[in-house]
Each structure stands twice: as structure tokens, then as C-alpha cells.
Amino acid sequence: MGTAELSEIAAAKDLQVAVAESLTAGLLASAIGSGAGAREWFRGGVVAYQTGVKNEVLGVDEHLDPCSPEVARQLAVGVRGLLRADLAVATTGVGGPEGDDGHPPGEVYLGWATADAVGHRRLELEGEPHEILAATVDAAVELLTSLAADHE
């Protein structure tokens, strides 16, 4: 699955999509935004790399571990509301090369939010930092495509 399939489904269903990024620092929005027709359905994204931005802009609870399923979910809910999207996906985790606060490199969480549901996926990725980021973007696009396909 790639951005072309996501674009086709989102456009056909007249969906509006948004992303919140911590780990991927804009790579996901870039991948989506470079696709044909994205301006019709891609609302945009928020890069919330620092914890303060997560809290202040997207309403993430400041007491949570930034590398957690709950933060991933809150990021998705926050950006969906902020950008008035039908569905949203968020990325957070540790890209490496070193671990962070007890989390190993490659521990990644994708959060998602629609009008009716919120959830997350945990990924355990291996490789160099650029490989972990690329795999995270691919997984996020796949998740968005699946959410769009299932959207009623």
C-alpha cells in the first residue's frame, strides 16, 4: 500500500485526513503531501517533536511517557480535532540509534482517531534510524489507507 491508494480512497470517499508527528518529524506529511491529488483530502499535519508542543498544541497529558500508546492516541485525537479531519494518524517512539528512557530503538506507536473510535498499533522495528523512520512512515500510510477503506 502506498500514498496512491490512500489518495484514491480518500478522494472517492471525500475524506479529510490529518497527521501528528513526533518521531517522524514531518516525513509522513511530506510523503502524503507529495502524492497526486493530496490537496483535495490532506488537511495537513503538526510536527510535535518536543513534549511541550504535544501538550500545548495537541492537548497531550504532560504526565505521560512520550513513547507510549496513550500519547500516540492523544496525538491523533488532538490533530483530528485541531484540523477538523475525518481521520488522523500520529507517530511517536524511539528512532535510535540509542534507546530513550528505557525504550529501545525501534519501539514505535501509531495512534489513530476517527469520529467513532481511537486506537493504536505498536511496532517493533529494527535498523538504522533512517530505516526505522522510513518503516514508520510506510506503516502509518498503510494504517491510514486501511482506516480510509473501512470508513463508512
Model-derived regions: residue spans:
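Short alpha-helical segments enriched in small residues
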Residues: 1-152
